[in-house]
């Protein structure tokens, strides 16, 4: 833990604050995403004073004493609850909406989708013609399907493909690919969960290699002019900024994009536009986010043809609002 802290912060007080925040009891705020229209009279208390600018108006923040996950709104699929730091990781996508790119995002592929939060919030943000939620670990797909069903996310497909297989089935089809990558899970400590070996060099190196493989396969899924969001819930530079440096060097047709609402969270460790939320900021367990755009617009297939290509090529475990044949 201390070794990672020294890499992240040169200031001794900052190192101390980081380590203390990792093991301190979390504020346990909850972010509540309204799947359709937000209620003016929710059954839980909303703390509007605690809402930072990077959270859109249709996502509320509740205090630690509230339990929106046990509310009638949750049971009926009107809301999805997640850690505020997960919303931070998606903030670059909200900037696309603000920059009037919404109409360009019609096909989304979420590569590491379980339990579904980032895909569901992205669907709410863009309302695409199709979202594909992929989860390679079969034991995690039950929760993913359950959440998509409960929130009535459609048109949607849930798949369980290795990233390499998915990349071999379809190419250059997605307007947006989300890679919320499996990682060393260092932020689990903030949630009071065990994270054995999360700060060990071998664990970090293993995840770095795994993340690069997922990123490499994800790159081929992005259509020219499309976007890729890379996010983790860990703190090691190797799994975050170094991966982005490697990715941009390996795939020079991708460039990082600035996110104005996250300017104060800009990472000092990256050469591009990447952003970090730490547990000492008080909004959840922590996150890293970087948004990239693929250059080019030539030979871009119409969205209907791209959706048809995905539907005909990829066999889903579950789907809604899609004629898969």
In which residue ranges do the predicted regions lie?
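S-adenosylmethionine
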Residues: 1-325
């Amino acid at each position: 833990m201390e070794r990672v802290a020294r890499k992240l912060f040169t200031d001794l007080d900052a190192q101390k604050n980081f380590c203390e925040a990792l093991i301190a009891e979390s504020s346990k705020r909850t972010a509540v995403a309204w799947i359709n229209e937000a209620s003016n009279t929710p059954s839980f208390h909303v703390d509007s004073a605690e809402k930072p600018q990077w959270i859109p108006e249709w996502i509320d923040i509740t205090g630690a004493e509230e339990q929106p996950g046990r509310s009638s709104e949750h049971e009926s699929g009107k809301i999805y609850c997640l850690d505020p730091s997960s919303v931070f990781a998606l903030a670059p996508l909200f900037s696309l909406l603000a920059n009037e790119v919404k109409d360009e995002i019609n096909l989304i592929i979420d590569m590491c989708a379980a339990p579904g939060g980032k895909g569901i919030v992205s669907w709410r943000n863009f309302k695409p013609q199709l979202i594909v939620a992929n989860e390679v670990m079969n034991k995690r797909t039950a929760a993913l399907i359950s959440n998509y069903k409960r929130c009535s996310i459609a048109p949607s497909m849930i798949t369980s493909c290795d990233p390499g297989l998915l990349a071999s089935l379809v190419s250059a089809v997605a307007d947006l690919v989300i890679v919320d990558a499996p990682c060393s899970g260092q932020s689990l400590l903030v949630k009071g969960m065990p994270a054995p070996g999360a700060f060990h060099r071998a664990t970090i190196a293993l995840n770095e290699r795994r993340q690069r493989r997922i990123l490499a396969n994800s790159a081929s899924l992005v259509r020219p002019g499309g976007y890729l969001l890379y996010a983790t819930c860990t703190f090691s530079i190797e799994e975050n900024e170094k991966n982005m440096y490697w990715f941009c060097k390996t795939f020079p047709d991708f460039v990082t994009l600035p996110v104005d609402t996250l300017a104060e969270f800009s990472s000092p460790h990256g050469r591009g536009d990447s952003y970090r939320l730490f547990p000492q900021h008080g909004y959840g367990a922590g996150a890293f986010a970087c948004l990239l755009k693929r250059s080019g617009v030539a030979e871009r297939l119409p969205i209907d043809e791209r959706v048809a290509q995905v539907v005909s090529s990829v066999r889903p475990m579950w789907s809604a609002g899609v004629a898969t044949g």
